[in-house]
A protein has these predicted regions:
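Phosphate/dinucleotide-binding and metal-coordinating scaffold of catalytic cores
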Residues: 1-8, 26-383, 393-395, 399-407, ...
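Acidic carboxylate motifs that coordinate Ca2+ or other divalent cations, activating on Asp/Glu
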Residues: 13-17, 21, 320, 385-391, ...
Length: 653
């Protein structure tokens, strides 16, 4: 998820109808392009440009994207009587954009308040003026033009009652970081046994007559969702957007709603009374003694649901979850005033711990992962490529070192320590929307967590200071070492690959540790020392039990009865749902349903070989998980995680 949108709709909506037609979108695009070219946009660093996807996670190399098969409504089977999210159905969605330039148009309007209209045909029925935008953050920025990006479809964009099977918003997800496509479906299947969670199945998407292959079709958290689970469309909803430096901790920040509004995005009416009740929840959670917490909190929070929520996150290792990032989840306050904490994006599940917010994984993050290489490589290319040929020569790379050092050494002292370097590095690697804290300031931008590792790498004499000659020497050495083709220059992929090997994992740090007396240290949140590694899938079920920055875990698990109940849920999930005898047949059925389409998919982010292996074999890379350039087989994860949890001393009780 991205942060606050860039608002341009009102500025270019000349006829005041609340949306932009083609004639209005043209100047809006030109405006955004100029803003971003001048550095006035809000994206900081953008997606990969040009043809080609992220290159996979270190398994079989992804082929360059190319046009898919031509398909029309008469070429596929219709399912007019099947529910929209029927998991046995592979339904086809035909999108017709007004322009063949639709990819660039969606990219121009990414993270703005503008929808691009399409004609949508499903099961032989046509829906007009459906609004479409690219969704996601890492799943967008790590994917180049021509490869599959996630889509959000608003059926009610222009016609308020328009829906498919009672659903007004669709999310077509690109299976970023998941070569199997199965992870969201499996996680949500299990989650719905414990708490309100989205429905999901697979969809075949055809755009302007060309197949774009298989997407995960995941239900939107909106009024339709609330109606299904709670029997009403009333109540308040919040989205805690995905952010590697997530601040959606449910900590008490005082009584002023302004302190919360930059973190928790309210999706319903911005009512002061609603905010007051939310702030009360945070205050009670954080400031009530453990022996009084359950009684005080029960009227405000579905405590049992919260325990199930954190148990699912941990047992199934959700690398986008509250336990690691304190973001990318949803909150609902029902009509009785009680709050419910619900899952958000779950594509990075059934994996080894890693990714933004964690110290595990590979070195600097796989070339296609959302890590320092993906952040740095586009900036290096855009800032150093003076002749605009999409390559960096050794001379250009060396000149870039001079430009960077001039910016970093503002005081002209001739050298920088790590603190000075990191502080100024934010000017070289600006924060995109969603990274900075509310109220401005650099805060937790990419420069903050990439800077220390970058400094350590280019400080070649390891004396704790960086000189111009050291920076130039490092860049010139990289230019030679990473030029695998001996062409005299580096393209962006070479930069990413080289940076992935050269840089250490980012430092997120912070208070942490497992719970219990004498417990060892666990993964840490933003703000402190480097986090320890976790062996394989051995993520402690009591991780963050002593972390004050994760009160939904630490405060609830400080109550012995709640701790025991939580561990009971962990035990049940491991014993029942991670048993491959139960999980395997479901995964195999899903795999078989989409296998032929995935093989034929010319826009997918991973190879067919990785798709086939991912069910029962590890896909090897420089490491495992989103930052490590590999992917763990689903069966391997289930077997190993189940064995570890069922043998964990407090889970066995």
């Amino acid at each position: 998820m991205m942060g606050q949108q860039t608002k341009v709709l009102k500025q270019f909506d000349n006829n005041g109808d609340g949306r932009l037609d083609a004639s209005e979108r043209k100047p809006a695009r030109e405006f955004l392009q100029k803003e971003r070219a001048a550095g006035g946009g809000r994206r900081g660093f953008g997606p990969r440009e040009g043809p080609g996807g992220p290159g996979g996670r270190g398994g079989t190399k992804q082929e360059a994207p190319k046009p898919g098969a031509k398909l029309g409504p008469t070429d596929v089977k219709s399912f007019p009587d099947a529910p929209l999210y029927d998991t046995k159905t592979l339904r086809t969605f035909f999108l017709e954009f007004e322009s063949q330039d639709w990819e660039k148009e969606l990219a121009d309007f990414h993270n703005t308040d503008v929808e691009v209209p399409v004609k949508l045909t499903v099961d032989g029925k046509t829906y007009l003026d459906v609004g479409v935008h690219y969704r996601g953050m890492s799943s967008y920025m790590a994917v180049g033009e021509g490869s599959k990006r996630s889509l959000n479809l608003a059926l009610d964009f222009a016609h308020k009652d328009q829906n498919i099977g009672g659903y007004r918003t669709l999310n077509m997800l690109n299976a970023h970081e998941d070569p199997t496509y199965l992870r969201p479906l499996l996680f949500l299947d299990i989650a719905r046994e414990y708490l309100p969670a989205a429905k999901a199945n697979f969809a075949r998407v055809v755009i302007n007559g060309e197949s774009w292959g298989i997407y995960d079709n995941v239900q939107q958290f909106n009024k339709d969702f609330v109606k299904e689970w709670f029997g009403t469309t009333q109540g308040a909803r919040w989205k805690v957007r995905g952010n590697p430096g997530g601040q959606g901790r449910l900590t008490y920040l005082g009584d002023d709603p302004a302190a919360y509004k930059g973190i928790y995005t309210i999706k319903t009416k911005d009512d002061p009374k609603v905010w007051a009740s939310f702030i009360k929840l945070c205050k009670v959670l954080n400031e009530t003694p453990a022996d009084k917490l359950e009684q005080a909190l029960d009227p405000l929070l579905d405590i049992d649901g919260a325990l199930r929520f954190i148990a699912l996150d941990n047992a199934l290792i959700n690398n986008d979850g509250y336990w690691i990032r304190t973001s990318d989840y949803s909150i609902y306050q029902d009509v009785k005033g009680r709050f419910h904490v619900l899952p958000g994006d779950v594509n990075e599940t059934f994996v080894k711990p890693g990714g933004p917010g964690f110290g595990g994984g590979g070195r600097g993050g796989g070339p296609g992962g959302f890590g320092p290489p993906m952040m740095l490589a586009p900036q290096m290319m855009s800032q150093g490529d003076k002749d605009a040929d999409q390559k960096l020569t050794k001379a250009e790379f060396s000149a870039l070192a001079d430009v960077w050092f001039d910016k970093l050494d503002a005081d002209k002292a001739g050298k920088l320590n790590q603190e000075q370097f990191t502080e100024k590095f934010a000017d070289i690697l600006p924060a995109p929307e969603g990274f900075g804290p509310p109220g401005g300031g650099r805060g937790f931008g990419p420069g903050r967590f990439v800077g220390p590792g970058f400094f350590a790498t280019v400080d070649t004499d390891k004396d704790g200071s960086l000189t111009r000659s050291e920076l130039k020497g490092a860049f010139e050495k990289w230019s030679s070492d990473w030029d695998s083709q001996k062409s005299g220059s580096l393209n962006e992929e070479m930069l990413r690959t080289g940076l992935s090997a050269a840089l250490p994992p980012p430092n997120f740090g912070g208070p942490g540790g497992r719970g219990g007396q004498g417990g060892g240290r666990g993964p840490r949140g933003p703000g402190g020392a480097t986090m320890p590694q976790v062996k394989g899938v051995e993520l402690d079920p009591l991780v963050a039990a002593n972390d004050p920055n994760k009160p939904l875990i630490s405060k609830l698990l400080a109550v012995p009865a709640l701790r025991a109940r939580y561990l009971g849920y962990v035990r049940e999930i491991a014993d029942k749902w991670l048993d491959w005898k139960k999980l395997g047949p479901v995964a195999e059925r899903y795999h078989a349903l989409i296998a032929n389409d995935v093989k034929a998919d010319t826009r997918k982010l991973d190879s067919t070989d990785d798709f086939e292996k991912g069910l029962t074999q590890d896909i090897q890379g420089s490491g495992m998980g989103p930052f490590g350039g590999g992917s763990m087989g689903l069966k391997q994860f289930a077997d190993q995680r189940r064995a570890y949890l069922l043998n964990y001393s407090e889970v066995k009780k």
